[in-house]
Amino acid sequence: NPNFINLCLNENLSSEITLQPLKRFDLDAAIIFSDILMLPYGLNQKVEFEKGFGPKLGEVNIEEMSKLDEIDFVQKIHPVYKAIKKVSSSNIVKNKNKNTIGFVGAPWTLLVYIINQQSPKKNLKENFFKNDFLINRILLILEKFLKIHIKNQIDNGADVIQIFDSWAGLLEEKDLPNYIY
């Protein structure tokens, strides 16, 4: 759905989608309806979802990304935090003593999407690993904004944050200490 990001940015719909399973089943927690690619979106990279293909990201503008400040980033994805607050303060979560789970993509996995501009299972760019300077520069930006994103999720009611590192398996063992942390 090309409007998936818009759905994630609709605090009313995303909180309702999050709460639906708790209304039907006796689950331990509410997992926020969102996507790990909200972070690249917050960094002003175009993010769309194509039916039958998956995520497609626009060209990365490293200069724009490095100049982005915390206020602009948080403002762009603020509806995600409002949805977390809505879920964590909902009667079903509070009255049934349920936890609220937020999540992020790990730096490496986000880097793969940002540079590759799509899922690596579709195609991994041939020169992906050749620009260490670019990789390390983006990782530093991701570290900064992941901390902000995690803190905002917790400040708005997430009890725990799950970190997804979906593409760690692309690395050779010797590279793990450099990129998985």
Please give the residue ranges for each predicted region.
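Short glycine/proline- and acidic residue-enriched helix-loop micro-motifs
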Residues: 3-4, 63-72, 128-135
